């Protein structure tokens, strides 16, 4: 197999792990594209992306255009004369002229089994929907949003204990090896492309903080899925006397209740049991304002008065039943 001359485009840690796999492979990473440095931390100093930092460590040329619609940026990319461009969580739109520039086009590593979840938040939406599996898709990019032909797919069972954080880690481990396998197939022209079935497609839009507000009229199962999907961001929450209480971990109880949704049924070291629209949810890890996430057992040692059985939680504040 003849090694490919690769341009890599990506920004966060998830992307950097794929870049590392490329650096370790027989292919040649001739340039890296990443988003411009952003202010970060308390001092708001400009900070390089994980992808840029890794590229510089390995002596790879870095390009940081604000847009790839710019003709000068496009001319720079063309001059690199790449065989292929690998795109992983880059964050910039690639116009058609860019997609067509590398000899073999552009491929993308997408964190779901397409076409089930297209868009920005496939990991979170898969959890929220109660999917039993997810995976990674290596896709030939076209001008649509995650609509290109599929080149390779992996599968990963979603466990009951999984959150967006744990799935992110698992897919960050699966993705790099899938990418290298796909590149081998592309280099040998032995990887058949599969069209996406449009009837199976859903759009995984970016999460919002508003969506993370817990609605106790939903079923315990739905709330449990939401809490897992919103961990680690933006974190499911409810209000108590004007304070935002974040919920990090929970599970569905075998109990049933005829109490009003949002009613605290019990509170002890094993968790806080809350009646929902259907079933009972047990919260086991929470975060009080200005504090770090703690087990319910630890929180009850200091704030048991906030979790008195009989209290009814609403989507805006608490009321005594």
From Swiss-Prot:
Family membership: Belongs to the Fmt family.
EC number(s) on file: 2.1.2.9
Catalytic activity: L-methionyl-tRNA(fMet) + (6R)-10-formyltetrahydrofolate = N-formyl-L-methionyl-tRNA(fMet) + (6S)-5,6,7,8-tetrahydrofolate + H(+)
Top EC category: transferase
Lineage, top ranks: Bacteria, Pseudomonadati, Pseudomonadota, Gammaproteobacteria, Alteromonadales
Matches recorded under InterPro entries: Fmt (IPR005794), Formyl_trans_C (IPR005793), Formyl_trans_C_sf (IPR037022), Formyl_transf_N (IPR002376), Formyl_transf_N_sf (IPR036477), Formyl_transferase-like_C_sf (IPR011034), GART_AS (IPR001555), Met-tRNA-FMT_C (IPR044135)
CDD domains: FMT_core_Met-tRNA-FMT_N, Met_tRNA_FMT_C
Gene assigned in the entry: fmt
Coiled coil: none
Name used for this protein in its record: Methionyl-tRNA formyltransferase
Keywords: Protein biosynthesis, Transferase
Cellular component, GO, one term: cytosol
Pfam family, one: Formyl_trans_C
Binding site for (6S)-5,6,7,8-tetrahydrofolate: 112-115
Role summary: Attaches a formyl group to the free amino group of methionyl-tRNA(fMet). The formyl group appears to play a dual role in the initiator identity of N-formylmethionyl-tRNA by promoting its recognition by IF2 and preventing the misappropriation of this tRNA by the elongation apparatus.
Molecular functions (GO terms): methionyl-tRNA formyltransferase activity
């Amino acid at each position: 197999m003849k090694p490919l001359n690769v341009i890599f485009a990506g920004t966060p840690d998830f992307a950097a792990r794929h870049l590392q796999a490329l650096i370790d492979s027989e292919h040649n990473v001739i340039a890296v594209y990443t988003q411009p440095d952003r202010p970060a931390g308390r001092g708001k100093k400009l900070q390089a992306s994980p992808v840029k930092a890794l590229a510089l460590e390995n002596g790879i040329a870095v390009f940081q255009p604000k847009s790839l619609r710019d003709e000068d940026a496009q001319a720079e990319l063309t001059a690199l004369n790449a065989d292929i461009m690998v795109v992983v969580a880059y964050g910039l739109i690639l116009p058609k002229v860019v997609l067509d520039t590398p000899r073999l086009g552009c491929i993308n590593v997408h964190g779901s089994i397409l076409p089930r979840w297209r868009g920005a938040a496939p990991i979170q939406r898969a959890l929220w929907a109660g999917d039993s599996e997810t995976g990674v898709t290596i896709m030939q990019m076209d001008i649509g949003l995650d609509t290109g032909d599929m080149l390779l797919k992996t599968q990963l069972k979603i466990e009951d204990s999984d959150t967006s954080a744990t799935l992110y880690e698992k897919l960050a481990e699966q993705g790099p090896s899938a990418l290298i396998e796909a590149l081998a197939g592309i280099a040998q022209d032995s990887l058949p492309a599969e069209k996406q079935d449009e009837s199976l497609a859903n759009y995984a839009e970016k999460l919002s903080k508003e969506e993370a507000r817990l609605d106790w009229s939903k079923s315990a199962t739905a709330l449990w899925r939401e809490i897992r999907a919103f961990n680690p961001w933006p974190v499911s929450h409810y209000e108590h006397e004007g304070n935002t209480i974040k919920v990090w971990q929970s599970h569905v109880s075998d109990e049933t209740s005829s109490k009003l949704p949002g009613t605290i049924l019990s509170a002890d070291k094993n968790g806080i049991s809350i009646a929902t629209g259907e079933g009972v949810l047990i919260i086991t890890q929470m975060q009080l304002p200005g504090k770090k996430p703690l087990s319910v057992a630890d929180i009850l040692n200091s704030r048991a008065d906030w979790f008195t059985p009989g209290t009814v939680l609403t989507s805006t504040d608490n009321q005594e039943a």
